[in-house]
Amino acid sequence: VNTNLLSRRGLLGAALGGAAALALGAPASASPRAHRPRVLVATNEPWGTYHVRPLLAEAARRGWRLTQLVPDLSAIAPGDPVPVATPADAPAADLLVVTGAGDWPADCAAHFRRLPLVASSLAYHQPVQAPRAAELRRRLRSITSSSPAESRAFARHLGTRRPIRVVGSPQTDDLPPRRPEADLVLVLTSVTHPDGTGGAAPGTELLLASAEKLAAAGKRILVGLHPREDRTLWERYEISEVPSVTASARAEVAVGIPGTVFPLVAAVGTPLVGCVDPALTVPDYLLAVCSSTIGDAGEAEAAVAGAALPEPAVLADAVGPVGGSARRLLDAWSRAIPAAH
């Protein structure tokens, strides 16, 4: 396994250059406008403030006000740093950002029908047109995504052939240096039980069984818990107190149900093994960053022993540009706001 983060970032940037230029069609950043925009955000996971949280520091630096739209306050944890409001109580705004064409973003777009609209992918989407995508398409001033691969899936989700600006993932703006600890395996969960915030991914039983096999083989298990996962399922192991991307810097290998975090963990330099239930459906690029995939817990030990990073071109396609992503994203939003309010 190549653990040289600096050389890998160089390869990542070099491999991405051509693809990013084609996807962007314009410079990735521009100077922020002099005014201080007020932005409403509606996510496919209505109470999923973890998608907006990585943007708060850049918004504060600019003096922007971000507010996430939620159906109600029932699922907002005390002390959550993301400002939230219902559509009825939302503050005046200059822009509405939707992270997909699910029911909640589409409902919010209909409610705020006079606001400029931008679509920004902050998590993976199935590459199939959403039933309500047509409600959004004509209004969209711009579209952004984290990576070239994600932009292809997002285009299909929205049912559009328009150019999509690739800005990178804000979660990669401050990647930790990789310092793997001997025999430490990071287990990346998904969500076992769907709730009002979002759906679930099959494969928890396979992942639990794989963790048991690895622990029995002498591996130390550290769990990177999805924000909506049932914590009680994993309490027999150490549960990371820091985000999974940060925790991955300690691990020799990560094993989990493929999801949005997979390319980000690979960007840190940690190889991935995907636990793939037959019922799991995810975009191909999330599988492409895996060293291998397993469908039986008995395969886990060998898969971990042989885990390696994907080729640089595959990694660049799935991860997008690293560093400055929150800045590029807010720059893109700024361009969609009329110069005069």
List the model feature ranges, each with a label:
Residues 261-317:
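Catalytic binding pocket for nucleotide-activated donors in carbohydrate/polymer assembly enzymes
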Residues 83-86, 238-243, 290-299:
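Short acidic-hydrophobic, aromatic-tinged amphipathic segments that line or gate anion-handling sites
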Residues 25-39, 341:
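C-terminal segment of N-terminal export signals and the immediately downstream linker at the start
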Residues 299-341:
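C-terminal amphipathic helix plus adjacent low-complexity
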Residues 2-6, 10-30:
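N-terminal export signals
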Residues 40-172:
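Active-site and donor-binding regions of nucleotide-sugar-utilizing enzymes
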Residues 47-52, 58, 172-174, 180-233:
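Conserved catalytic-core segment of nucleotide-activated headgroup transferases in glycan assembly
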Residues 227-268:
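Donor nucleotide-activated moiety binding/catalytic core segment of transferases
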